[in-house]
Design a protein with these regions (language model features):
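Auxiliary, metal-adjacent structural segments of Zn-dependent hydrolase domains
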Residues: 44-145
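Short pre-active-site segment immediately N-terminal to the catalytic Zn-binding motif
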Residues: 148-166
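Post-HEXXH active-site segment of zinc metalloproteases
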Residues: 160, 178-199
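Metalloprotease/metallohydrolase-associated module, dominated by Zn2+-dependent proteases
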Residues: 190-262
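Bacterial N-terminal signal peptides
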Residues: 8-14
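Active-site recognition of the HExxH zinc-binding catalytic motif
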Residues: 163-178, 213
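Positively charged n-region of N-terminal signal peptides that target proteins for export
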Residues: 1-4
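Sec/Tat signal peptide C-region and signal peptidase I cleavage site
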Residues: 17-21
Length: 262
């Protein structure tokens, strides 16, 4: 009996030590759980209207080179998407999608997902840019960049991760101070220092630019969708990053269409 108690205590201490030594909670980053939002969640998207086909300037990761990456011109189908709060977002779909009908399918798909996000994550966006390709998404410059064939954004074991990626990139646009977002650098950094742990390995690796975007998925999980993740993960998050959670709580976010408690 004593051996069992000692073994249990040792395992608990070892787990705690590993988290502290690693300094992050989730090794698989946001792919730890891709059920925070799903296609069953309400979307505030009201309608999408086609406007025109024209040449625009924007970002496309396929154009990146070893020497850098800059905006380029491409021809796009232009749609205006309207949401319940009156927000109108321009969705730009690359004409590589053959025709207006195919382009509208893409605009509808990602416009609906964007409409599932809480209002506070939709406060600083002007455009959504959609290309084909397997490159990673991006968020910043008042834009969300989508590559529809991004290889790691669907995980059969944990579900489709597209909604969680949309949350992540929208956090860059609407929350990151580096992109004119609503959060302030100093109190965030103070909260992070007090926590002493990052939410994910990715957040730790790129702490200056990814901590906010990685954290917000899990704030939404514990405050708005606690049944979407395991009780053990809820406990890890609440105990691991209490100061960041508190700072986010203090923002009094408009979380519609999600119902949140904090």
């Amino acid at each position: 009996m004593l051996k069992k108690i000692l073994l249990t205590t040792f395992v608990s201490l070892l787990v705690s030590f590993n988290v502290q030594a690693a300094k992050y909670i989730f090794k698989k980053d946001l792919w730890t759980n891709c059920n925070i939002l799903s296609d069953k969640d309400q979307s505030t998207l009201k309608n999408i209207d086609y406007q025109e086909e024209k040449k625009v300037k924007g970002w496309d990761r396929r154009k990146a080179t070893a020497n850098g990456w800059s905006e380029n011109f491409f021809t796009a189908f232009i749609f205006f998407s309207t949401f319940e709060n009156g927000q109108i977002i321009t969705i730009r779909v690359n004409t590589e999608f053959k025709n207006k009908l195919e382009a509208k399918k893409q605009a509808m798909k990602y416009g609906k997902i964007y409409g599932q996000l809480p209002n506070f994550l939709r406060s600083n966006l002007n455009t959504i840019t959609i290309h084909k390709g397997k490159r990673s998404w991006g968020g910043g410059n008042n834009d969300i960049l989508i590559h529809t064939q991004a290889k790691d954004y669907s995980n059969k074991k944990v579900g489709d991760c597209v909604e969680e990626i949309m949350i992540h990139e929208s956090a860059h646009v609407s929350l990151d101070w580096s992109w004119g977002g609503s959060l302030k650098k100093k109190p965030w950094m103070e909260a992070a220092k007090a926590d002493g742990v990052f939410i994910s390995r990715y957040a730790k690796r790129y702490k200056k630019r990814e901590d906010v975007a990685e954290t917000i998925n899990w704030w939404i999980a514990v405050r708005c969708k606690p049944n979407s993740i395991s009780k053990s993960d809820v406990k890890k998050i609440i105990e691991g990053i209490p100061n960041r959670l508190k700072y986010l709580d203090q923002q009094n976010f408009d979380t519609h269409p999600l119902k949140c408690n904090y």
